[in-house]
From Swiss-Prot:
Any one GO biological process: biotin biosynthetic process
The keyword Iron-sulfur is annotated on this UniProt entry: yes
Required cofactor(s): [4Fe-4S] cluster; [2Fe-2S] cluster
Residue numbers spanned by region Disordered: 310-356
Natural source organism: Rhodopseudomonas palustris (strain BisB18)
Swiss-Prot/TrEMBL keywords: 2Fe-2S, 4Fe-4S, Biotin biosynthesis, Iron, Iron-sulfur, Metal-binding, S-adenosyl-L-methionine, Transferase
InterPro entries: Aldolase_TIM, BATS_dom, Biotin_synth/BioAB, Biotin_synthase, Elp3/MiaA/NifB-like_rSAM, rSAM
Cofactor note: Binds 1 [4Fe-4S] cluster. The cluster is coordinated with 3 cysteines and an exchangeable S-adenosyl-L-methionine. Binds 1 [2Fe-2S] cluster. The cluster is coordinated with 3 cysteines and 1 arginine.
Reaction(s) the record says it catalyses: (4R,5S)-dethiobiotin + (sulfur carrier)-SH + 2 reduced [2Fe-2S]-[ferredoxin] + 2 S-adenosyl-L-methionine = (sulfur carrier)-H + biotin + 2 5'-deoxyadenosine + 2 L-methionine + 2 oxidized [2Fe-2S]-[ferredoxin]
Binding site for [2Fe-2S] cluster: C110, C141, C201, R274
Name listed for the protein in its UniProt record: Biotin synthase
EC primary class: transferase
Length: 356
């Protein structure tokens, strides 16, 4: 099964790398499951409290009518779904929603707009939202599609903490999912965001019809960026009627999903790894294995954009049974170790999942 020796786990601090090979990443993914879980859990404990989970809440601030053709997304104007397009919400309404999220235990508030890219006139209300969320003492995250350098700078100047922009899958499989933009377009926006000094939230979706090698390659692409994404959301596809991928989606083996979480944790030791969309389709036992494998972040609340979420009562029950607690941010055993190389699903924007 595994022909490459796994490195020793003896080191007390995680090794941050940006030069993973296909062979190394595949060897980790396909390692005997017990060895994989032990390695991931050990690396997780080197930087994080394994009993603390970071909690986010997501709000769709502009729904539907998106010009992109992402094959899984209910918000695309290219697909025949029942989702009506809406205008951008008023900043005051968004901030009221953020207050409720904070009262419910969220430390980060994520705002998604279904755009290919924001128009310059849209930036002022979005910046007002960001500043309002920050004034509540919460971290702010937005996903707005592709950005210009100036738009990224405006968001950074407003104090934005995170920008979500998912790769979704591997570069090879990507054209089977999206045709209105390229993988390079996605990477280009990530670079603009990082250059502006904003932390990156970037992950993908499992269940699009991809092969295991596509999952490995997506994570390898992220792990080989000059700076790892501070947050890596892993989504389980919830097929949406009327989208092309709902006709071709393939169920994901729960063990394969857990392997993907473990690989993300091992290759990006200081990043938050998030169980994003699709938790309603996961058993408590599957989610528990994900937490053991290094997932340390979730979305709370009843909905994520256009898909359901377990809701606070169900999450509270699972946390109680596992002895988990919401993390009082900010971060890794004080997140101080992020600074040395790293500074750390939701495309809630043009996508119909949480992708954050």
């Amino acid at each position: 099964m595994n022909t490459i020796d796994l490195p020793s786990l003896a080191q007390a601090t995680p090794t941050i790398r940006h030069d993973w090979t296909r062979e190394e990443a595949a060897a980790i993914y396909y390692a005997p499951f017990m060895d994989l879980m032990f390695r991931a859990a050990t690396i997780h404990r080197q930087s994080f409290d394994p009993n603390k989970v970071q909690c986010n809440q997501l709000l769709n601030v502009k729904t539907g009518g998106c010009a992109e053709d992402c094959g899984y997304c209910g918000q695309s104007a290219h697909h025949h779904t029942d989702l009506p397009a809406s205008k951008l919400m008023a900043p005051a309404d968004v901030i009221e929603s953020a207050k409720a999220a904070k009262a419910g235990g969220a430390t980060r508030y994520c705002m998604g707009a279904a755009w290919r890219s924001p128009k310059d006139r849209d930036m002022a209300p979005v910046i007002e939202m960001v500043k309002g969320v920050k004034a509540l003492g919460m971290e702010a995250c937005v996903t707005l599609g592709m950005l210009s350098d100036d738009q990224a700078k405006q968001l950074a100047d407003a104090g934005l903490d995170y920008y979500n922009h998912n790769l979704d899958t591997s570069e090879e499989f990507y054209p089977s999912v999206v045709k209105t933009r390229t993988y390079g377009d996605r990477l280009n926006t990530l670079h603009k965001v990082q250059d502006a000094g904003i932390k990156v939230c970037c992950g993908g979706i499992l269940g699009l019809g991809e092969k295991p090698t596509d999952r490995v390659e997506m994570l390898r692409t992220l792990a080989n960026l000059a700076k790892h994404p501070e947050s890596v959301p892993i989504n389980l596809l919830i097929p949406i009627e009327g989208t092309p991928i709902s006709l071709t989606a393939t169920p994901v083996d729960p063990i394969a999903f857990v392997r993907t979480i473990a690989l993300a944790r091992i290759m990006m030791p200081l990043s938050d790894v998030r169980l994003a969309a699709g938790r309603t389709a996961m058993s408590d036992e599957m989610q528990t294995l994900c937490f053991l494998a290094g997932a340390n972040s979730i979305f709370i609340g009843d909905t994520l954009l256009t898909t359901p979420n377990p809701g606070d009562n169900k999450d509270r029950s699972l946390f109680d049974r596992l002895g988990l607690e919401p993390r009082d941010d900010h971060g890794v055993h004080e997140h101080s170790s992020h600074s040395h190389t790293h500074d750390q699903g939701h495309d809630h924007g043009p996508h119909g999942h949480s992708h954050g």
